[in-house]
């Protein structure tokens, strides 16, 4: 085989390898993306179907119920409520009436099955998306 043909085969093989690597990276990134939605968007059917996503809002007062390691509570944006089930130990800062972001999937019964629970870590901090969603929900709730 001539050196020119060898070089061409090496270049073609390298391009194919780079293409396969790029596809694998994009696939991995796509499967790790968790979209952020509000309880109102979930109730309106705007949540992603069949994939994990995040819900942000406030933990509704009086909704926290523990059954062994399973915890049931309600996340709200002050306009709509979504029931949540989580198996595991909650973060220390997780409390009723405080902000939280929950990652997981909806089940067929309309309950959000959480795989991860993040609690608001500072008295004054709230993610911009959650603050905007709560402000919108308050405006919509007071307009009715």
UniProtKB/Swiss-Prot annotation:
Indicate the principal place this protein occupies in or around the cell: membrane
> Where does this protein hold heme?
121, 125
Per the record, what ranges lie on the membrane's Periplasmic side?
A: 29-144
Q: Which residues lie on this side of the membrane: Cytoplasmic?
A: 1-7
Q: Does the record carry Cell inner membrane as a key word? A: yes
* Taxonomic placement: Bacteria, Pseudomonadati, Pseudomonadota, Betaproteobacteria, Burkholderiales
Q: Where in the cell is it found?
A: Cell inner membrane
GO function term, MF aspect, one: metal ion binding
- Protein role: Heme chaperone required for the biogenesis of c-type cytochromes. Transiently binds heme delivered by CcmC and transfers the heme to apo-cytochromes in a process facilitated by CcmF and CcmH.
- For whether the record's keyword set contains Iron, the answer is yes
**Family per UniProt?**
Belongs to the CcmE/CycJ family.
Transmembrane parts of this sequence: 8-28
What name does the UniProt record give this protein?
Answer: Cytochrome c-type biogenesis protein CcmE
One Pfam short name: CcmE
Question: Which UniProt keyword terms apply here?
Answer: Cell inner membrane, Cell membrane, Cytochrome c-type biogenesis, Heme, Iron, Membrane, Metal-binding, Signal-anchor, Transmembrane, Transmembrane helix
GO CC, any one term = plasma membrane
Q: Name one GO biological process term.
A: cytochrome complex assembly
Task: Tell me the membrane topology, using the record's own terms.
Answer: Single-pass type II membrane protein
């Amino acid at each position: 085989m001539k050196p020119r043909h060898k070089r061409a085969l090496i270049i073609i093989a390298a391009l194919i390898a780079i293409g396969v690597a790029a596809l694998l990276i994009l696939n991995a990134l796509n499967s790790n993306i968790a979209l952020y939605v509000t309880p109102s968007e979930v109730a309106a059917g705007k949540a992603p179907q069949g994939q994990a996503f995040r819900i942000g809002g406030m933990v509704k007062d009086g909704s926290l119920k523990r059954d062994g390691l399973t915890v049931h509570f309600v996340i709200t944006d002050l306009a709509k409520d979504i029931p949540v089930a989580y198996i595991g130990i909650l973060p220390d800062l997780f409390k009723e009436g405080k902000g939280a972001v929950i990652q997981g999937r909806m089940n067929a019964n309309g309950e959000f099955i959480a795989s991860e629970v993040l609690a608001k870590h500072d008295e004054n901090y709230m993610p911009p998306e959650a603050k905007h969603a709560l402000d919108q929900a308050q405006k919509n709730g007071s307009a009715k």
